[in-house]
């Protein structure tokens, strides 16, 4: 129960405003007779409520107590319950009310030495002033207070620990996210490097293939060109004259197997000119192809020319059906007889 007293050093005197009180009770005359009322009335005049606090009107403005919070017990068993305001009388005695200047006013508050624990299970609430005297330390209220303080301290510690754990978990999650991002970046860089290496390898392979194809093409072209060069025989400068001579001989001889001057072969050959003496310096092979018949047989004509067996060209099977040079030129007027071949040539 909290009682807000505005005046700290007043003794409570309960008075009944309904009971009449004589105005002359307070003092007496010299001869001991009580004062009476004025002669107008002729009877003792009761004090009216207006005159009761006439002299102390300013003092009574601050002497009221608000008893609306809880009803108080009467001062005596015979006195009626308090109604309205209660008058007080100033004395020199001290009240048990302790003044409080915590809020900046002089209103006293009652001293409370325990917790107010509600019944609904909510958190405990301290009173405005919690003063515990020395003699009350062994009371059970102090044990409740210490237990509640320990619980509050434990709750604060638990909250701090939970907050620290949450902060550490959050930091770990942030670090994991950063590490995952770094790993993803490294993987992307590795993929880019692999793509670049693959591109370089593909380009190198393409270049090598192109070079190989070009080299193969060049080799094939060279082989084809070489075969063409080898297969094409070089014509003799007097080949046309030889053809003319062969045509004349064909007209003179009615032999079907006569040589017509057309040689169908892929091997390059060189035929001697018809007149060896005239082109002896330009065609030294004439001496190799032809020599006098004296070297082969003594009965032959000294001026007859026969193909030598040592000639690799004339010994070929292609020249088996070719008539001899001796029968070709023996009856020709334009044939010049040559002297015998000297040994110095060989």
UniProtKB/Swiss-Prot annotation:
It comes from Dictyostelium discoideum. This is Putative uncharacterized protein DDB_G0288043. Residues 26-44, 94-109 have a biased composition (Low complexity). Residues 56-67 have a biased composition (Polar residues). Residues 10-109 are annotated as: Disordered.
